[in-house]
Amino acid sequence: MKEIIIYTDGACSGNPGPGGWGAVLAYGEHQKEIAGAEADTTNQRMELMAVIEALKAIKGSGWEIRVYSDSAYFINAIQKGWLENWQRNGWKNSKKEDVANQDLWKALIPLLRKNRVRVEKVKGHSGDRWNERCDQLARNAIKSLG
């Protein structure tokens, strides 16, 4: 089975402030770019929105998907088991505080379960062409807010 490759990025002008997200999805020779923006948000919310919207754009289930992100927040939550711990602990973090962005994490969980998703860290602003493209999509989305 072929793999769907997803690159994502989020950006914020001020944190909080106007924010945007961008994603590139690639399957074989096919490629799709998506982006969006919110008037008042945070960088971390935009990073998560990029992943959520990219996974929503995939039709069907059972796909092999690899998500590349420069967000340590997203990558660590998945790879280090933070997300599982948060769920198990009633959405409290290690400091017994409410987990930030619960609404987005809760929206992400069924999307992760629908397919076989692996996540990988990409260094931001390091010349990776797809990460740079996602950053451009996110920044253009912010500009579209006016």
Swiss-Prot record:
Q: Where does this polypeptide localize?
A: Cytoplasm
Q: Which SUPFAM superfamilies does the record associate with it?
A: Ribonuclease H-like
In the record, the note on similarity to other proteins reads: Belongs to the RNase H family.
Q: Does the keyword Kinase apply?
A: no
Example of a GO biological process term: DNA replication, removal of RNA primer
This chain belongs to which protein, by name?
A: Ribonuclease H
Which GO MF term does the entry hold, naming one? RNA-DNA hybrid ribonuclease activity
The EC number on file is 3.1.26.4
- Signal sequence: where? none
Q: Which residues bind Mg(2+) 2?
A: D9, D135
Keyword Magnesium applies: yes
Q: What CDD domains does the entry give?
A: RNase_HI_prokaryote_like (cd09278)
Q: Name one GO cellular component term.
A: cytoplasm
Which parts of the sequence belong to the RNase H type-1 domain? 1-143
Q: Which amino acids does the record list as binding Mg(2+) 1?
A: D9, E47, D70
Q: Which cofactor does it need?
A: Mg(2+)
Task: Name the catalysed reactions.
Answer: Endonucleolytic cleavage to 5'-phosphomonoester
